[in-house]
Amino acid sequence: LAIHGLNASDTSGDFIVSPTHVWIKNDLGAARYFTVPTPGAPNDPGGIVGFVADTEFSVDRGFHSEPFELAIATATERATIRYTTDGSEPTESHGFLYTGPITISSTTVLRAAAFKEGFEPTNIDTQSYLFLDQVAVQAGAPQGYPSSWAGVSADYAMDLNPTDYARAAGDASFSPAEARAATVDSLKSIPTISIVTERDNLFDPATGIYLNPSGRGVQWERPVSVEIIGEDGVGRYQTDAGLRIMGFTSRNLNTTPKLNMRLLFKKQYGDAKLDYPLLGPEGPDEFNTIALRGNIRDAWVTEHSGFGSALYIGDEWAKRAQFDMGQPAPRGTFAHIYLNGMYW
């Protein structure tokens, strides 16, 4: 503090300075974080007191055969947890209020987030719990899902015709129980990718990408959760990404109800890259995008010469043979795909 005192003139003999320091305390309250930067401008008048600690689950994503109790917790005191089971994103006003352990007895895609007034909420955590005994006999359209896709009959169910089911399971002599057991084993034989999103992102008549498969570009990209589950049924990886329909003639639902899709990993959703060795130890362990091909030219939708004529492996075999001969070739693998808990 500096005091500057002046007398009347340089010849004046009287000079007195009697400063008084008066201070006022302004209670600014608790420190706050600003979620929106305002360089060169006043701070955002809002701000947050802190961040809600991430949600924790007592049971991780994966395969299950028996019912279990699922507990969800956050270390932040007096925080509220909300969850959904229909693929939608929980908010402070949307979703079930978590009050205690939840009984999980069937295939469930559960999304949860924690909230507290004045705090930044958690991100949305997604957990897919897949009961393969039920998946193996998956029924028709779930409640709220359309019975037709852009004028084409929707196809959600497993083909449970005993003869076809046995042959698809690997042996025409299988009993229904044996075919079901073999199907369950097959569902555990290769990696699983579970995609979870708002139902309307897929099936809204005007904006859903599955009902408007000709839509291209970022305007037809929808946010999704992506989970990778290993053959042993243990969850390996989860991130959020963008999802688009891809292909040319394969976009036609009259040709195939099983559309090709593409996952795009971007920072605006979650991880900027998929950081997981999806194609095995010899393949890359980082991906900007992944194509999920339905392989319509060599699958059940194009078995024009009869049931069982498709090989399913022709395209991938050709790529691997090309690569093994020292030539450039795209890498690929096989995986089971689920959309909002439904086997696809």
What are these regions (language model features)?
Residues 11-13, 301:
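Extracytoplasmic/secreted cell-surface and envelope-processing proteins
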Residues 14-223, 228-239:
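Short, compositionally stereotyped local motifs that mark structural "simplifiers"
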Residues 3, 102-104, 290:
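A compositionally biased, intrinsically disordered/low-complexity signal enriched
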Residues 3-11:
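Short beta-strand-plus-loop segments that form exposed binding edges in beta-rich domains
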Residues 195, 201-202, 208-344:
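Conserved ATP-binding subdomain of kinase catalytic cores across diverse folds
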Residues 5, 85, 294:
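Short glycine-centered, acidic/aromatic-flanked micro-motifs in structured strand/loop junctions
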